[in-house]
Amino acid sequence: NTRKVVAWAKKKGVSVEAEIGAIAGIEDFVSVEEKDAHLTNPERALAFVKATKCDALAIAVGTLHGAFKFKGETVLDYDRIAAIKKLVRMPLVLHGASGISPELVERAKSQCSILGDCARLENAHGVSDEAIRKAVARGINKINIDSDLRIAFTAGVRETLMNDKKAFDPRKILGPARALMTEVVKHKMELFGSAGKA
């Protein structure tokens, strides 16, 4: 129960991010089908925040967990974000917001015949930069982009192993992956408006 977690965490000086609504996709081996997903109701969000006293609230406004989000354009409910922000007046979190860079997907898919099956990346498509900008403008404060970092890491490791078949030093294998992830993080910090704010 979220209320119990918040009470315990506050005693330890730890903040709690809670989630209301259900986001489709797979996260931490838990799968939610699109038919079972539901968007966050603003009034229920307010009641939830009052009841739990959480520090940040992750809301469901149309994103999906994982690398396979949309068949076409990103469709987020910006009015819902603004309505929730107006009521709860706390940091709002957007889960499942990876952009899934086509360039990095292609790099991760390179040499799939040797390093593994990448057919599942064929349909990878994420949340557009423009959609993120609009979500931030409406009140989103924290944005989760795990799939972007996984794809960058995978691309960096695969490229290194393909270019140097004798590589066995983890520092030389992981270094390029870390560098690609760093580039993604730099771009996202600019996009989110968080660059230079420590």
Language-model region placement:
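C-terminal alpha-helical cap/extension of soluble enzyme domains
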Residues: 112-118, 127-198
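Alpha/beta enzyme core
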Residues: 1-94, 99-133, 137, 159, ...
